Amino acid sequence: MFAVIKTGGKQYRVAANDVLTIEKLEAAAGDSIEFTEVLVIGEGADAAIGAPFVTGASVKAEVVEQNRGKKVIAFKKRRRQNSKRSRGHRQHHTVVRITDIVAAK
């Protein structure tokens, strides 16, 4: 069974025991979280498609760790002016493991 969940402005196709990196959530490592914005749930032809979300469906997960992504450099240069500016950014991420997919009753 799989589900498509929405979190952090993105959509992820998940199944049980999947490990995925998502946008930062306020939760410590080892905490249990629940995603209620489920867009699709099921398997094959009997998949339930929400409008926009499947009522009563949820996906349970546990937080594995909090980390940061690779550094992205924003570099601006003004030609012939001997002027440049460099700025780095590292996005915060949360790594979660999907533990259970609960279908609507």
UniProtKB/Swiss-Prot annotation:
Tagged with keyword DNA damage: no
Gene Ontology molecular functions: rRNA binding; structural constituent of ribosome
Record's GO cellular component terms: cytoplasm; ribonucleoprotein complex; ribosome
InterPro entries to which the protein is assigned, alphabetical: bL21-like, bL21-like_sf, Ribosomal_bL21
Pfam (any one): Ribosomal_L21p
Keywords: Ribonucleoprotein, Ribosomal protein, RNA-binding, rRNA-binding
One example of a Gene Ontology biological process annotation: translation
Classification via NCBIfam families: L21
Job description of the protein: This protein binds to 23S rRNA in the presence of protein L20.
Subunit (UniProt): Part of the 50S ribosomal subunit. Contacts protein L20.
Family: Belongs to the bacterial ribosomal protein bL21 family.
Protein name from the UniProt record: Large ribosomal subunit protein bL21
Gene: rplU
